[in-house]
A protein has these predicted regions:
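Outer membrane beta-barrel transmembrane domains
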Residues: 49-155
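Outer-membrane pore/translocation modules
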Residues: 1-53, 152
Length: 155
């Protein structure tokens, strides 16, 4: 099977960071056909030009893909992400709302098409600790976040 180079990217907080990441994934013929996860730790080196120091982040993501063995060569994926954020700082002052802990279960459906592999994903983050978990002063605020993504991978 021929492999081609590709790039993964994400938006940044604007700080230079140390990033330590490890991944472990397995592929097999029976279900789950693909499973594993990654662990990433990000630690900011210094404040950016706006005097912002991003919080350290610890991210654990686990996933498993189950092939349906149907005529569309589709598969179902299940995942769980855990993200812990430390405190960020503006001008050396601790951000009161930057520390958090969230858990995000994910469901995905992948189907092969004439254009490539088409994936539909839905994720629901739950904030266990941090600013989105509590409502200080009962001021009628809150969050109800859903994430939807559609991706096309062409080989």
């Amino acid at each position: 099977e021929e492999k081609s180079d590709h790039r993964h990217f994400s938006l940044s907080s604007g700080n230079y960071k140390y990033v330590i990441e490890t991944q472990l994934f397995f592929k097999q013929q029976e279900n789950p056909v693909f499973y594993g996860g990654f662990l990433t730790y990000e630690y900011p080196i210094q404040e950016n030009k706006y005097n912002y120091l991003a919080p350290p982040l610890l991210n654990l993501s686990l996933s498993a893909t189950f092939k349906r063995f149907d005529e569309k060569d589709s598969s179902l994926g299940y995942g769980l992400g855990i993200l812990q954020s430390g405190h960020g700082y503006w001008n050396g002052v601790k951000e009161p709302n930057s520390r958090s802990l969230s858990v995000s279960p994910t469901f995905s459906y992948l189907i092969n098409s004439r254009f490539g592999a088409l994936s539909f994903n839905i994720s629901k983050p739950y904030f266990l600790k941090g600013a989105f978990n509590t409502n200080e002063g009962d001021i009628g605020q809150g969050s109800n976040i859903w994430q939807f993504t559609v991706s096309l991978r062409k080989v």
